[in-house]
Amino acid sequence: ITSDKRKTALFFQSIGILTPNIVAMRDVKAFPVFIRPYDGSRSTFAYRVDDRKALETFITIVPHPIITEFICGQEYTVDCLSDFSGNVLNIIPRTRLEVSNGVSVKSAVDLDAGIIRDTKTILQALQVKGASTIQLIKTKDDKRFFTEVNLRFGGVAMLGIASGGNFAGKIVDMLQGKRLQFANHSVKDGYVMVAYLNHHFYDPNH
């Protein structure tokens, strides 16, 4: 389900979770639309398409393409942790304020109750065990369109950890057989991460 975005979309629909509608090439009537590989990751080969001519070009470039309606709104990543029985322990949504090559370089924790509720529904339906990362777009009228589930820690999971998620400590507790409960109370809402590119200089003669 999680490795094929077509199956992921059908799964979301089956449990009452909003997701962008998939559109066949011949049925595209309005623009913009969004195109990407149905088995891709990050932002590789992912494009907003604004007209028919561009779509006809991108459909030949993008491998294993899937076309969906374009949803305008705030992008979110949700860092999640479940125990080995599928019980949810942490759900930490964060806004993707600035993105480079599919990875957030500026992000802020937002403990949005609706996102947390929908994410818990997804995790419980999938019976996810361990770490997972869920992507969605939240519109201005508070509709939440979920787009993918990745069964791993995200590239910026350190924000969830730094804000109080303590994923590593909980995994150690799980390995020791301790029973844990869902707990977001230690997470700092609004906590911000900014990533910088650092340059280091070395003199080979010294």
What annotation goes with each model-predicted range?
Residues 1-73, 84-87, 113-117:
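Active-site nucleotide/adenylate-binding loops and adjacent lid/helix of ATP-dependent enzymes
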Residues 25-28, 186-192:
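Short linear loop/turn motifs
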Residues 21-23, 133, 183-185:
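Residue-level detector of family-conserved "landmark" positions at structurally sensitive sites
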